[in-house]
Regions:
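Transmembrane helical bundles and short interhelical boundary loops of multi-pass, membrane-embedded
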Residues: 64-67, 97-108, 112-147, 151, ...
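Hydrophobic, aromatic-rich transmembrane alpha-helices
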Residues: 215-219, 223-255
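Short acidic/glycine- and proline-prone juxtamembrane loop motifs at membrane-interface regions
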Residues: 20-33, 78-81
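Membrane-interfacial loop-to-transmembrane alpha-helix junctions, especially the N-terminal start
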Residues: 7, 60-64, 231-233, 251-265, ...
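Transmembrane alpha-helical segments
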Residues: 1-2, 37-49, 70, 87-94, ...
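Membrane-interface transmembrane helices that cradle and orient dolichyl/undecaprenyl
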Residues: 2, 6, 41-64, 94-101
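Short helix- or helix-capping micro-motifs
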Residues: 11-16, 23, 72, 76
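Transmembrane-embedded, aromatic-rich helix segments that form part
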Residues: 81-106
Length: 354
């Protein structure tokens, strides 16, 4: 994605030292699996965008599409948030496909109008017009397989252990009924919860979710587990995401496809929650975090290319991220800490950490 090891490392570094990543994966919640698959499906769609539709052998463009669809299926089979990501994936694919279609239409027009074309441009137009129809058709057919048939097979296959039971009420009809039951359940979860939070609070890291507190600690000591974001990662990431949106609107996304990739990826995983009426929690933001991290890396990459003082700023930012990770580590893992230490971590009145 970045083609530069230091910036690839920076993205990995920020994900490693984010609080939410630690808390959710350490507790073994299901969220870590779909988040991984969402990252991979978007990555391989980006790889597909960089393939040359007209100059590479057609079959070489297919593995990226196949892997994107494969991980999309695994993501949806893990948790329904994978469906949100799939919408963003579809937007990216049809944007790529639309660009190639425009190239084909433009090439046909240039050849039909018999403009004075250079030999090189005429050869390009003839190459495009000769290859597009067949390749476009085969791409669509492959996408039906990669993004419909295979994901559906994976989703149904995730019920294999249920379906293999030789007993009544263990068929595909019951699998379908379970989907309806899950949908109706989530549609009707309106009871309040002491640690619920709204979608607009998540990027600002306003409300944590408190998982555990020990009631057997000696006086002056606390053992507690919470999930929230690393303020340095989340607050900086929000600013960098806004920067990406502005850059995309200004047209920079035409030159650097990664900007739109990040913006669409974030929007697909975050905006559906705006419309969800049920009770929600900060961990629902987990799938959006990789995209604010990538927005941060894009910002620092741009800064590094333009400013000589960018390197110490980036290093200082990384030191801050690690320092906060170390400071908050006990309240993310349940390691005993003094009450005084715990009191230092309550940066916002809405945070309940112990």
């Amino acid at each position: 994605l970045f083609r530069k090891t230091p910036f690839a490392f920076l993205g990995t570094f920020l994900m490693t030292f984010d609080f939410m990543h630690l808390a959710q994966t350490r507790l073994g919640t299901i969220d870590s699996y779909p988040v991984l698959f969402i990252i991979l499906e978007f990555y391989f769609m980006m790889r597909y965008a960089y393939h040359s539709f007209y100059h590479e052998k057609f079959w070489k463009t297919l593995p990226s599409l196949f892997l994107s669809g494969l991980f999309m299926g695994l993501g949806m089979a893990s948790k329904w948030i994978g469906i949100y990501a799939a919408v963003g994936l579809a937007v990216l694919f049809f944007t790529i496909f639309g660009t190639r279609t425009k190239e084909y239409i433009a090439a046909r027009r240039e050849l039909a109008e018999e403009k004075t074309l250079s030999a090189e441009r005429r050869a390009q137009c003839e190459n495009i017009t000769s290859k597009y129809p067949k390749r476009a058709l085969w791409t669509i057919l492959c996408c039906v397989l990669f993004f419909v048939v295979i994901p559906l097979g994976i989703y149904i296959g995730s019920y294999y252990q249920f379906l293999r039971i030789d007993a009544p009420h263990h068929g595909l009809k019951e699998v379908w009924n379970y989907q309806l039951h899950m949908f109706n359940y989530h549609k009707g979860v309106f009871e309040s919860h002491p640690f619920e939070s709204s979608w607009w609070q998540w990027p600002l890291d306003i409300r944590n979710i408190w998982y555990y507190v020990s009631d057997s600690m000696p006086q002056g000591w606390v053992s507690s587990i919470s999930a929230l974001g690393n303020p340095a990662v989340w607050w900086t990431g929000l600013g960098c995401l806004i920067w990406c949106v502005v850059r995309a609107v200004q047209g920079y996304g035409k030159r650097d496809k990664r900007i739109w990739w990040v913006v669409i990826g974030f929007a697909a995983n975050f905006l559906p929650w705006v419309l969800v009426p049920r009770v929600t929690f900060v961990y629902h933001y987990f799938a959006s975090v990789p995209f604010i991290i990538l927005a941060t890396v894009l910002f620092f990459e741009d800064l590094y290319d333009k400013k000589t003082w960018a390197k110490p700023v980036i290093i200082g930012f990384m030191v801050l991220v690690v320092a906060l990770y170390a400071l908050f580590y006990p309240v993310l893992t349940g390691i005993p800490m003094t009450s005084f230490h715990a009191s230092l971590l309550k940066w916002l009145p809405s945070w309940t950490l112990y």
